Regions:
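Short, intrinsically disordered or compositionally biased N-terminal tails of bacterial proteins
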Residues: 1-6
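Short, solvent-exposed loop/turn segments at secondary-structure boundaries
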Residues: 7, 81, 118-121
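Alpha-helical structural segments
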Residues: 10, 14-21, 25, 39, ...
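Short helix/strand-capping hinge loops at secondary-structure junctions
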Residues: 22-35, 51
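Phosphate-coordinating loops and pocket residues in cytosolic domains that bind phosphorylated ligands
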Residues: 30, 38, 59, 108-109
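Short hydrophobic/aromatic patch on the recognition helix
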Residues: 41-51
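Short secondary-structure transition hinges
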Residues: 95, 99-123
Length: 123
């Protein structure tokens, strides 16, 4: 892979990882793009090269959290003996995640108001 492409992916991942921590801790309203810049060590130009707005950063964070939630619940259900047990294990796994600060703040509290109800339902 081209070195510039690799650096771009790395920069984007760093922005998302930093914003994920900040949004989980302080919520969407309590997190500024300035704080994301400071904590990630990314330049303003690099941030806006990858994301058009704070909302776009949040959408990328939401997608990453949703991917992790789906993977975790799928792993929990993978060893089930039957479909009912798989549902029970997946749901229990989701409830455990939902009790955690990250999923509660990003997915359950902020997502519908930041990205809109329709997009939130599609996640």
């Amino acid at each position: 892979m081209n070195k510039n492409i690799e650096m771009g992916i790395s920069t984007r991942e760093r922005i998302v990882a930093t914003a994920r921590e900040l949004f989980a801790a302080a919520g969407y309203e309590g997190t500024s793009t300035e704080t994301v810049l400071e904590k990630s060590g990314i330049s303003r130009g690099a941030l806006y090269h990858h994301f058009a707005s704070k909302e776009a950063i949040f959408a990328a964070v939401l997608e990453a959290v949703e991917v992790d939630v789906a993977a975790t619940t799928a792993r929990a259900a993978a060893n089930a003996r039957d479909p009912v047990e798989a549902l029970r294990l997946a749901f229990a796994s989701f409830l455990d995640l939902a009790c955690g600060q990250e999923v509660r703040q990003i997915v359950l509290i902020d997502a519908h108001s930041v990205v809109g109800w329709q997009k939130w339902r599609e996640c």
